[in-house]
């Protein structure tokens, strides 16, 4: 052991055993991963922990994500009622369980706690926290673009000579966040003495760059070990303690309050992307916020919406903004705009469904949601039928003005993916474990299927089904591909020879189904066979994958999108990868084909839109 390491270890041991230093500190309680649902054990133990905290002396209490299990309005209201009893200033960040499975499309948690980020000052300390994602679909954590801008501008404002910064996020400053390097690069420019996260329900000391970080406990650490974290910040040290309810604090980590860091250089966002041979690649748009939607098209424009509730029409040829409007509730939008008839565009959003004029964005109609948000991708069929999934319902609306024609409202959770339609069959999944087929004519139920599992998160809630003449084929997070008789709804076969999830598509002639697996493979399956018949598998070299991005075939090329900004093109005839193209670091929202030009368009969560054209 070097002398430097020995000295550092001795100083750490001394810091952890000097109670006098801790008593002089700014002191915070951190609750992380409390996972409260009404009446569960965590509900009871959180109440006990809050009562214990109220007997102490703290400067603030920070709740660092995963307040609930499913982010429902009921669960958020319940945990808020418990947290309101805390007598100290309270600051709350959502976690992936509030962002990913949300009854309100993340709106309720923001409204309840006044936002999804915070900053406050305590003497010479600036404490700052931002949201982690992932947002309303399976994905890696992601810091929204507007939150990165806010973080820098906020630290510019608050950090004056003599100030130190303590950072909070539910996710670690590691590869769990697709854009953690951009996040870290900002923090490294300021006197950040530490970063504190949860998520893994475990203790861990680690470095991000040269910033010291701590992964801290959950409310429930098993074996009846319920508790929270105490953080003390003194002029020279930050101390982190494990506090089991009813027991004395136990020292875990101590950080030397280092305030100068090595700058982290990032690649320029203007980096030129080299197009694969035989293709052109153009960046159509770069947004100042994050984009969670797929894309809609008409003759001139591409349409999408962002995390600030801005809906935009951009000329797809020259990349110029045609118009931009805010949805009425200004909440993040997760559904793609749907181009309708007579210069009309439907914009599903958290609180309703807006119909706007495609030429200027002028609001024509605004239909308020009966219950819950619209997060599903709607569809306009070639025959002119507009179908839109919602919360606990799916609707057919008039394509001229969005007026409701019928609704099927016997769902138990929200729709998310676009439905599949052929003839009178409308097939769609919902996050209630079920796949349903209803009549296009009147919305009456024809059949319902589920995989027999009770967990909503294992059902076909975010997959676009494939319809053949006699089958419905799906994949789901239970890691099966399933074929169902299209007429009766009876299960024909199931296969788990690959780790399927939610990414599915089909060949142009409907004879093959393509699935992207969790191992980064593209699997081709015979859609005409009465039994499961694998045709071929290509390793796309993506490694671990979970992005629900659909697979699409155009002009003899199969396109798949990844969780880390890569679009891969596969030649189905040669059964080989043509090319893989990195367009960014974040998830590809979808592979969308422009019906006018046949070009492939993709949007990335980081806010960019690209066009890929075959020459």
List where the protein language model places each region.
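His/acidic metal-ligating clusters that form di-metal
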Residues: 53-60, 139-212
């Amino acid at each position: 052991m070097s002398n430097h390491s020995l000295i550092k270890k001795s100083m750490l041991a001394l810091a952890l055993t000097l109670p006098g230093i801790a008593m002089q500190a700014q002191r915070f309680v951190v609750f992380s991963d409390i996972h409260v649902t009404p009446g569960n054990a965590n509900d009871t133990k959180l109440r006990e922990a809050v009562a214990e905290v109220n007997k102490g002396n703290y400067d603030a209490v920070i709740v660092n994500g995963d307040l609930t299990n499913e982010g429902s309005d009921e669960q958020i209201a319940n945990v808020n009622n418990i947290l309101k009893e805390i007598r100290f200033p309270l600051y709350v960040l959502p976690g992936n369980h509030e962002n990913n499975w949300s009854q309100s499309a993340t709106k309720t948690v923001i409204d309840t706690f006044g936002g999804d980020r915070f900053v406050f000052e305590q003497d010479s300390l600036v404490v700052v926290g931002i949201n982690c994602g992932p947002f309303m679909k399976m994905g890696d954590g992601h810091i929204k673009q507007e939150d990165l801008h806010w973080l820098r501008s906020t630290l510019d404002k608050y950090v004056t000579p003599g100030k130190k910064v303590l950072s909070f996020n539910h996710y670690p400053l590691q590869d769990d966040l697709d854009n953690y390097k951009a996040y870290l690069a900002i923090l490294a420019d300021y006197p950040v003495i530490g970063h504190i996260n949860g998520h893994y329900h475990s203790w861990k000391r680690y470095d991000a760059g040269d910033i010291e970080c701590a992964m801290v406990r959950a409310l429930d650490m098993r074996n009846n070990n319920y508790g929270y974290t105490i953080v003390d910040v003194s002029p020279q040290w930050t101390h982190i303690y494990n506090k089991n309810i009813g027991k004395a604090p136990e020292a875990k980590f101590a950080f030397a309050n280092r305030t100068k860091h090595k700058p982290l250089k990032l690649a320029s966002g203007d980096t030129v992307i080299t197009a694969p041979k035989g293709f052109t690649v153009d960046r159509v748009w770069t947004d100042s916020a994050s984009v969670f939607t797929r894309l809609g098209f008409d003759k001139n424009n591409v349409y999408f919406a962002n995390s600030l509730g801005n809906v935009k029409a951009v000329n797809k040829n020259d990349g110029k903004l045609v118009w931009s409007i805010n949805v009425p509730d200004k909440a993040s939008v997760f559904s793609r705009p749907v181009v309708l008839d007579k210069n009309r565009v439907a914009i599903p959003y958290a609180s309703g469904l807006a119909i706007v004029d495609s030429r200027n964005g002028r609001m024509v109609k605004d239909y308020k949601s009966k219950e819950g948000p619209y997060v599903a991708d709607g569809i306009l069929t070639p025959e002119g039928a507009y179908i839109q999934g919602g919360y606990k319902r799916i609707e057919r609306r008039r394509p001229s003005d969005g007026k409701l024609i019928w609704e099927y409202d016997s769902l138990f959770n929200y729709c998310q993916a676009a439905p599949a339609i052929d003839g009178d069959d409308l097939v769609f999944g919902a996050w209630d474990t079920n796949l349903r087929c209803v009549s296009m004519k009147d919305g009456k139920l024809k059949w319902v299927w589920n995989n027999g599992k009770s967990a909503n998160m294992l059902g076909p809630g975010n997959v676009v089904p494939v319809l053949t003449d006699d089958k419905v084929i799906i994949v789901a997070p239970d890691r099966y591909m399933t074929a169902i008789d299209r007429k009766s709804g009876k299960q024909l076969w199931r296969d788990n020879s690959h780790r399927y999830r939610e990414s599915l598509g089909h060949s142009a002639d409907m004879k093959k189904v393509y699935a992207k697996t969790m191992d980064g493979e593209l699997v081709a399956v015979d859609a005409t066979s009465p039994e499961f018949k694998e045709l071929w598998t290509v390793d796309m070299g993506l490694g671990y994958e979970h992005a629900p991005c659909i697979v699409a075939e155009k002009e003899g090329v199969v396109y798949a999108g990844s969780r880390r900004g890569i679009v891969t093109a596969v030649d189905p005839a040669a059964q080989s990868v043509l090319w893989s193209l990195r367009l960014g670091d974040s998830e590809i929202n979808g592979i969308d084909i422009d019906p006018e030009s046949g070009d492939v368009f993709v949007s990335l969560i980081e806010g960019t839109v690209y066009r890929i054209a075959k020459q």
